[in-house]
Amino acid sequence: MCEVFRRLPGTAPGSSPPAPATHRLRLLGRELRVRRFMIFCRFWAKMATNDAVLKRLEQKGAEADQIIEYLKQQVALLKEKAVLQATLREEKKLRVENAKLKKEIEELKQELIQAEIQNGVKQIPVPVQSDTPVQASSAVSTSVIQSTSVSTISCSIKEHSKGGGEEKKVKEKTDKKGEKKEKKLQSAAPSADSKPVDVSRLDLRIGRIVTVKKHPDADSLYVEEVDVGEAAPRTVISGLVNHVPLDQMQNRMVVLLCNLKPAKMRGILSQAMVMCASSPEKVEILAPPNGSVPGDRITFDAFPGEPDKELNPKKKIWEQIQPDLHTNAECVATYKGSPFEVKGKGVCRAQTMANSGIK
């Protein structure tokens, strides 16, 4: 029986077919070579792609390092700028404080000089120090000061050793000198206190309460804005909560003392005082005459004169005048019997309180 077979590649025509085992080995070897070649190609392709990725990563890392370094520099600059600004602010603050302290020192020095002059102490002018002092000159000046201080101390010891009689003479001479200097100062000083201490020193005016409310930090005080004929109303603090209802304060015409030194009352500056008839049991606001307008001046026929611009609290002028302010038997406000008068319009009075004090 004839055996028919397919001719394999690589067999010559008419040749006999190869043995089956040899043929399989050849096929396997050829397939292995093909697979090795494919694996080798894939490996080199992967290596090429990995190199590109690594290069990109290295480039990104370098860029990130540069950005981080730049940010560090910016943070350092910002810190330096903040420290510089804080230093400048502190320096400015210290300069202002130093200027205030210098001013206070100069004021205290002037007060001390005036007190020494009044007590008869002889004043010796102090040499002004130059802007560019030399160490040698400063040393000489200190030595001179030390020598003068030593000499003055020795002289004082000698004077004390001479006895009490000479001390008495020296004291009498200094007292006489002090009296002469005081007389000169009194004659040279402006005659501000030559005015009599009476009601003419008070700036009493008519005012109208524009707004009123309770003090935020005090239950017994009102805070009022009062028109006294000036460009802007004045803020006035009054202790009238327990005596006058709030609705009766609004738009009310009042008498104001306008030249007291402004003072803070529970944190709010009061620029005037509402005048009231007052007793331990009762308080009534003084009523101006009909037809009065804000800014009208209150005068006293028996006490003419112009009021002080501002009463000096050290002189106690208000404290000396106030005890003579009273309402008379007809409830008219008076000073030593002379009524509170608005020229051409009438007198000021309390509603019901007769023969009571005014403050």
UniProtKB/Swiss-Prot annotation:
Residues 149-163 are annotated as: Required for endothelial cell death. It is found in: Nucleus; Cytoplasm, Cytosol; Secreted; Endoplasmic reticulum. Signal peptide: none annotated. This is Aminoacyl tRNA synthase complex-interacting multifunctional protein 1. Pfam families: tRNA_bind. The gene is AIMP1. Non-catalytic component of the multisynthase complex. Stimulates the catalytic activity of cytoplasmic arginyl-tRNA synthase. Binds tRNA. Possesses inflammatory cytokine activity. Negatively regulates TGF-beta signaling through stabilization of SMURF2 by binding to SMURF2 and inhibiting its SMAD7-mediated degradation. Involved in glucose homeostasis through induction of glucagon secretion at low glucose levels. Promotes dermal fibroblast proliferation and wound repair. Regulates KDELR1-mediated retention of HSP90B1/gp96 in the endoplasmic reticulum. Its main location: nucleus. GO terms for biological process: angiogenesis; apoptotic process; inflammatory response; positive regulation of glucagon secretion; translation. Residues 156-196 are annotated as: Disordered. GO terms for molecular function: cytokine activity; tRNA binding. It comes from Cricetulus griseus (Chinese hamster).
